Regions:
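Charged, alpha-helix-forming regions
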Residues: 1-112, 118-236
Length: 236
């Protein structure tokens, strides 16, 4: 499915290649057989607006959106397992699937990075690719809702993936669920995460319980990321 390749590329960090090959990308969108005209048009507008930006501005916007906090992380298992040990095994299992289909990762790539997962699905027969999208549909809906809440143009890419998945997920209900969710990309929230890492460090070094308790009281209101149970239709 060429559509998955296109979206994968658009969800990657916007490097110089995006501008160099924008015409080819426009042509690939126009040639798509799985996108209705209105969706192809929306995708074309996204690409037009993105490539109209100064590359440095586009890169800064991308980093602010996807690299700060966990709520809009493009690492799929971040929204399922968090930092639990289950995440490591899930990574191993996914990596094995990639290798079975001849997809080799470099040392800096994580298997659950969404653009990489889409690249993998694009190599599969269409029916299998659609099933692969359905597997992550609750995560896609969650990310779409959070991006819409932040008025980000990137939300259109997740809406498109949900349409390709032909999923029955109610996006309005997902939006309602996260309506009062605290932002985790504010300076205060990011500082709280940093402080939490310090607590873990001090605990490992034998710091007294009183210091840890005092810290926990101070940051009791820090933002905690929501995790999904994708085996039950994306319910928390």
């Amino acid at each position: 499915m060429i559509e998955l390749v296109i979206v994968s590329r658009l969800l990657e960090y916007p490097d110089a290649a995006l501008w160099q090959h924008q015409q080819e990308t426009f042509e690939a969108i126009a040639a798509s057989k799985n996108l209705p005209k209105e969706d192809a048009h929306a995708l074309g507008i996204f690409l037009r607006d993105l490539t109209a930006m100064d590359p440095l501005d586009a890169q800064a916007q991308y980093s602010e959106l996807f690299d700060r906090g966990r709520a809009t992380s493009l690492l799929l298992f971040e929204h399922v397992h968090g930092e639990s040990r289950d995440r490591g095994q899930a990574m191993v299992d996914l990596l094995a699937q990639y290798e079975q289909h001849g997809l080799q990762l470099n040392s800096r790539e994580l298997p659950d990075h969404l653009p990489l997962y889409l690249e993998y699905l694009a190599q599969l027969p269409q029916s299998e690719a659609v099933e692969g999208l359905k597997d992550i549909a609750p995560i896609l809906a969650l990310l779409s809702a959070r991006l819409q809440q932040r008025e980000s143009r990137y939300a259109v890419l997740f809406d498109l993936l949900l349409k390709l998945a032909n999923t029955a997920i109610d996006s309005d209900k997902v939006a309602e669920k996260i309506a009062d969710e605290a932002r985790d990309d504010t300076p205060q929230a990011l500082d709280a995460v940093w402080e939490e890492e310090q607590v873990k460090f001090f605990a490992d070094k034998g710091c007294g319980d009183s210091a840890i308790t005092a810290h926990q009281r101070r940051f009791a209101g820090a933002v905690a990321p929501q995790y999904l149970n994708i085996t039950t239709g994306g319910q928390h």
